[in-house]
Curated annotation (Swiss-Prot):
HAMAP family: Ribosomal_uL10. Pfam families: Ribosomal_L10. One of its GO terms (biological process) is translation. Belongs to the universal ribosomal protein uL10 family. Forms part of the ribosomal stalk, playing a central role in the interaction of the ribosome with GTP-bound translation factors. Part of the ribosomal stalk of the 50S ribosomal subunit. The N-terminus interacts with L11 and the large rRNA to form the base of the stalk. The C-terminus forms an elongated spine to which L12 dimers bind in a sequential fashion forming a multimeric L10(L12)X complex. It comes from Shewanella denitrificans (strain OS217 / ATCC BAA-1090 / DSM 15013). Keywords: Ribonucleoprotein, Ribosomal protein, RNA-binding, rRNA-binding. It comes from the Bacteria. The keyword RNA-binding applies. InterPro entries: Ribosomal_uL10 (IPR001790), Ribosomal_uL10-like_sf (IPR043141), Ribosomal_uL10_bac (IPR022973), Ribosomal_uL10_bac_type (IPR047865), Ribosomal_uL10_CS_bac (IPR002363). This is Large ribosomal subunit protein uL10. GO terms for cellular component: large ribosomal subunit. One of its GO terms (molecular function) is structural constituent of ribosome.
């Protein structure tokens, strides 16, 4: 179905607005994926704060112009699904990576984070970023281990001091 110029401008504006507020973006090829599977993906995306849209390549290129995701323009070939993470930088990468495991025809093309292009083979770097709560927990564990280690070293020094005195 042909789109009117007004419709194209609306799509470009919508995707551009999503890109401006996003932390990261992932581009994928959704060719061969069933409608039911895409519906499941979109539902999961909404739950994770990820904006997902299938966009024509020329419209996608225009939408990302002047944003941090301009480096993705070379991946806009064939059917293009673009996902923007709004709440956590790794959310879209994690979502599409997990979706690709269950759908053999779904292929991640690449991602962008802070203006840097990340090829599909390195998508794990972005997908494995800890969430805010996970990062806080890791920091607390590190601090706890540091204080426990300091306590053990203090006890060992006290023991050594008593042995020398005896």
């Amino acid at each position: 179905m042909a789109l009117r110029l007004e419709d194209k401008k609306a799509i470009v504006a919508e995707v551009n607005e999503a890109a401006k507020g996003a932390l990261s973006a992932v581009v994928a090829d959704s060719r061969g994926v069933t409608v039911g599977a895409m519906t499941v993906l979109r539902k999961a995306a909404r739950a994770n704060g990820v904006y997902v849209r299938v966009v024509r390549n020329t419209l996608a290129k225009r939408a990302v112009e002047g944003t941090a995701f301009e480096c993705l323009a070379e991946t806009f070939t064939g059917p293009t699904l673009i996902a923007f993470s709004n709440e956590h930088p790794g959310a879209a990468a994690r979502l599409l990576k997990d979706f690709a495991k269950g759908n053999a025809k779904f292929e991640v093309k690449g991602a962008a984070f802070e203006g840097m292009f990340i090829p599909a083979v390195d998508i794990d770097r972005l997908a494995k970023l800890p969430t805010y709560d996970e990062a806080l927990a890791q920091l607390m564990m590190t601090m706890k281990e540091a204080s426990a280690g300091k306590f053990v070293r203090t006890l060992a020094a006290l023991r050594d001091q008593k042995q020398e005195a005896a």
